[in-house]
């Protein structure tokens, strides 16, 4: 093994592994950046993240990696943090655990208030991202599609930083006022992130962007004598510094002079809009807008904040009407790299968010709930994102035509795995007898002590199949969307250990399940047209059998559809490339050896009514989040009200 750390580089990849298989060639081609945008077509299990890490080191470019969901973003964040321990690897996702946006449904005359649950830990990580981007050059940001939503102006964030240097004089009263203006709060008793205190000649600040250290600045009279980072628990000195920049405690900071200008501009826009409604003889809308906006203005004057403050972002940032909002991409100066992971899913999400936001807000504006300037607080359009792009790599096992077109057909393939495993053999069988044939296939897997994934189209089918397999003495479990992360991990571990020999699921078996013991994937109703059985989905499902040297896929279908044939042909093409490579280089495929994750089993106890209600609240909360995500706001409100009723019954609010 070879360590690849380069001590004189800005980005230092630290690993004991060297690129193998197709990785060296892919890294070389991607690092050349022959076109501004490129596609990395990487088969399942070929180590795409490791390839990207090597490109980051070769290019020495600050990087943003965008994933299509929080879970995948978290996985990428952990991987890159391990690969770049000396660099600032940051995590930038939405800080809402639950978010139901404000909305108005004109057809039913229903107004829906904004409702949200904020995750303070994620909020702190977002501030950490902005702080690193403002103070360092060696930054890798891993984010979700929330990265295209607005954030604080880069110039404002830098402008508000407090800079301390050993030997310089400072006015202590001014320091206190500045910290308060940065949204820090005085707390002489206990320091937590976003708090500070003076104890004699010592200033201690717990930064809003980290929980790893407290900044201690010792003064001699008005001169800085010492700057240290100390452990918040032990008070042990971690680092002694010559200088330090303390950034804002929150993502958004507005000084008083800017706030005064913003309030003046909001009043002016309000008057113009009220006049417009009155001229249209829409008096009710004019009155409603005046009431809501004046209430918000009073809060802004008193506290510098109001409910729905995001609707006034353009005024608070002193931006021009219809201007592009600030985003994390504006924090990059010069050349930088954007990596869009699982681009076949992420890119459509990025494309659709602008129009979804516009549609919702336009109703609020048209009916007098919000000022027209609310439209200027929005996600970037894809065209705006493209204007900010410098270098782009789209990463996917199944890239779409859109990515290939954007890259001018510059597609770099990574098909050979570091384990030299080849794509599985595909067999098509008639589905008339698919259940009995499946049982025979599962039993045959026992000879090699391997496992089986079965993917079906509906929940009912999954439940019925699971029950029938149990009756036939097959050790089977059903994995579905409502299973929690810990329970999911337990199921996978039990499958790997042999407690189960088969797992039945729907689309959850498509991506993200890395189980080397699975040698057989069975696809029911492969010939039914639709998204779950299109070419890309089928290739993703097929990839679940690519972790085992005995990998096979059985498609149950009465005829071979065009989408099936494309998936079969592409898999055969990849398999041929992989086998030719192995023959040329005398490589033998070997099943991945992956240690089992230890998870303490959960012992279930008899539940009281309160415990049952608490469990139901958690389940309802999931449904509420799903309804809000699908913009089914009426259903979300009904579920929320049901939750409130249950909370009253058990006498306290359950944290969900």
UniProtKB/Swiss-Prot annotation:
Gene3D superfamilies annotated for this entry?
Answer: P-loop containing nucleotide triphosphate hydrolases (3.40.50.300), UVR domain (4.10.860.10)
**Which Pfam family is one of this chain's hits?**
ResIII
Q: Which PROSITE patterns match?
A: HELICASE_ATP_BIND_1, HELICASE_CTER, UVR
Ordered alphabetically, the record's keywords are: ATP-binding, Cytoplasm, DNA damage, DNA excision, DNA repair, Excision nuclease, Nucleotide-binding, SOS response
Q: Where do the Helicase ATP-binding domain residues begin and end? A: 29-414
What positions does the domain Helicase C-terminal occupy?
Answer: 434-596
Subcellular location(s) per record: Cytoplasm
User: Domain UVR, which positions?
Assistant: 614-649
Q: Which residues form a coiled coil?
A: none
CDD domains assigned to the protein according to its UniProt record, in alphabetical order: DEXHc_UvrB, SF2_C_UvrB
In its UniProt record, a GO molecular function of this protein is: ATP binding
Q: What is this protein called?
A: UvrABC system protein B
Species name: Mycoplasma genitalium (strain ATCC 33530 / DSM 19775 / NCTC 10195 / G37) (Mycoplasmoides genitalium)
Q: What is the lineage of its organism?
A: Bacteria, Bacillati, Mycoplasmatota, Mycoplasmoidales, Mycoplasmoidaceae
């Amino acid at each position: 093994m070879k360590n690849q750390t380069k001590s004189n580089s800005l980005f230092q990849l630290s690993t004991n592994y060297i690129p193998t298989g197709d990785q060296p060639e892919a890294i070389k081609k991607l690092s050349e950046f022959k076109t501004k945008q490129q596609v990395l077509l990487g088969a399942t299990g070929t180590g795409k993240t490791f390839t990207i890490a090597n490109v980051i080191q070769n290019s020495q470019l600050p990087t943003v990696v965008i994933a299509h969901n929080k879970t995948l973003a978290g996985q990428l964040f952990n991987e890159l943090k391990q690969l770049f321990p000396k660099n600032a690897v940051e995590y930038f996702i939405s800080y809402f655990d639950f978010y139901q946006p404000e909305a108005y449904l004109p057809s039913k005359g229903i107004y829906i208030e904004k409702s949200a649950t904020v995750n303070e830990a994620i909020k702190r990580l977002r501030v950490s991202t902005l702080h690193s981007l403002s103070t360092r050059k060696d930054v890798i940001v891993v984010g979700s599609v929330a990265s295209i939503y607005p954030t604080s102006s880069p110039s404002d964030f830098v402008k508000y930083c407090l800079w301390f240097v050993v030997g310089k004089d400072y006015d202590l009263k001014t320091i206190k006022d500045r910290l308060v203006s940065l949204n820090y709060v005085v707390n002489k008793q206990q320091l937590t992130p976003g708090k500070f205190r003076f104890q004699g000649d010592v200033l201690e600040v717990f930064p809003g962007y980290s929980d790893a250290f407290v900044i201690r600045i010792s003064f001699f009279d008005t001169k800085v004598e010492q700057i240290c980072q100390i452990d918040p628990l032990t008070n042990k000195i971690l680092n002694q510094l010559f200088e330090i920049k303390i950034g804002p405690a929150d993502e958004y900071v507005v000084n008083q002079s800017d706030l005064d200008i913003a309030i003046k501009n909001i009043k002016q826009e309000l008057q113009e809009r009220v006049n417009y409604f009155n001229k249209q003889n829409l008096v009710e809308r004019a009155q409603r807008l005046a009431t809501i906006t004046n209430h918000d203005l009073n809060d802004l004057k008193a506290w510098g904040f109001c409910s729905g403050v995001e609707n006034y972002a353009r005024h608070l940032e002193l931006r021009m009407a219809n201007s592009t909002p600030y985003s994390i991409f504006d924090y990059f100066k010069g050349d930088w790299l954007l990596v869009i992971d699982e681009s076949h899913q992420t890119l459509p999400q990025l494309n659709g968010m602008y129009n979804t936001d516009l549609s919702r807000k336009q109703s609020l504006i048209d009916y007098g709930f919000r000022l027209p300037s609310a439209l200027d607080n929005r996600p970037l359009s894809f065209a705006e994102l493209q204007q900010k792009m410098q270098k782009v790599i789209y990463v996917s096992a199944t890239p779409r035509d859109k990515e290939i077109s954007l890259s001018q057909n510059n597609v770099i393939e990574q098909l050979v795995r570091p384990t030299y495993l080849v794509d599985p053999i595909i067999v098509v069988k008639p589905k008339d007898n698919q259940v009995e044939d499946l049982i025979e296939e599962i039993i045959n897997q026992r000879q090699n002590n391997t496992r089986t994934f079965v993917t079906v189209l509906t929940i009912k089918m999954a439940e019925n199949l699971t029950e029938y397999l149990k009756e036939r003495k097959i050790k089977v479990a059903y994995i579905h969307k409502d299973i929690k992360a810990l329970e999911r991990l337990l199921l996978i571990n039990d499958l790997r250990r042999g407690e189960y020999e088969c797992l039945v699921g729907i689309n959850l078996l498509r991506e993200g399940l890395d189980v080397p013991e699975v040698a057989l994937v069975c696809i029911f109703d492969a010939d039914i047209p639709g998204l779950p059985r299109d070419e890309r989905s089928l290739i993703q499902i097929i990839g679940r059998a690519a972790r085992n040297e005995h990998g096979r896929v059985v498609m149950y279908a009465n005829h071979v559809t065009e989408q099936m044939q494309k998936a079969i042909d592409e898999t055969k093409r990849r398999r041929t490339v992989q086998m030719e490579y192995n023959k040329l280089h005398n490589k033998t495929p070997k099943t991945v050896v992956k240690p089992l994750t230890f998870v303490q089993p959960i012992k279930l106890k008899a539940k009281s009514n309160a415990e049952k209600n608490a469990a139901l609240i958690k389940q309802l909360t999931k449904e509420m989040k799903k309804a809000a995500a699908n913009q089914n706001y009426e259903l979300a409100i009904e579920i929320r009200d049901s939750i409130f009723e249950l909370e009253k019954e058990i006498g306290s609010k359950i944290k969900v």
